[in-house]
From Swiss-Prot:
Domain of life: Bacteria
PANTHER family in UniProt: 40S RIBOSOMAL PROTEIN S11 FAMILY MEMBER (PTHR10744), SMALL RIBOSOMAL SUBUNIT PROTEIN US17M (PTHR10744:SF1)
Keyword tags: Ribonucleoprotein, Ribosomal protein, RNA-binding, rRNA-binding
Gene Ontology CC, one term: cytosolic small ribosomal subunit
Name of the protein this chain belongs to: Small ribosomal subunit protein uS17
TM helices/strands, residue ranges: none
Taxonomic lineage from the root: Bacteria, Pseudomonadati, Pseudomonadota, Gammaproteobacteria, Lysobacterales
Task performed by this protein: One of the primary rRNA binding proteins, it binds specifically to the 5'-end of 16S ribosomal RNA.
Length: 89
């Protein structure tokens, strides 16, 4: 059923490290997360590489960026760069 008051879900945002900006208007971002091992309870780092839309080509390798989930832009791009949190040195 549809919501009567037309409420939208809050946008999903994640932070990641730009590892490649060789494509036009696209950056590859490494996103790390921690999961807890089911048996031993130890926290383990897992990482995912995502493609994000960078319309103005402002991002460089090593930048930390904030991304939000959007409707698919291409076959592999479902994220858009919202802001650059930290520049690389």
């Amino acid at each position: 059923m549809m919501n009567d008051n037309n409420e939208r879900k809050p946008l999903r945002t994640i932070k990641g490290l730009v590892i490649s900006n060789k494509m036009q208007k696209t950056v590859t971002v490494l996103v790390e997360r921690q999961i807890k091992h089911a048996l031993y309870g130890k926290y383990i780092k897992r990482s995912t590489k995502l493609h994000a839309h960078d319309a103005d080509d402002l991002c460089n390798e090593g930048d930390v960026v904030l991304m939000t989930e959007v409707a698919p832009i291409s076959k592999t791009k479902n994220w858009r760069v919202v802001e650059i949190v930290a520049r690389s040195d």
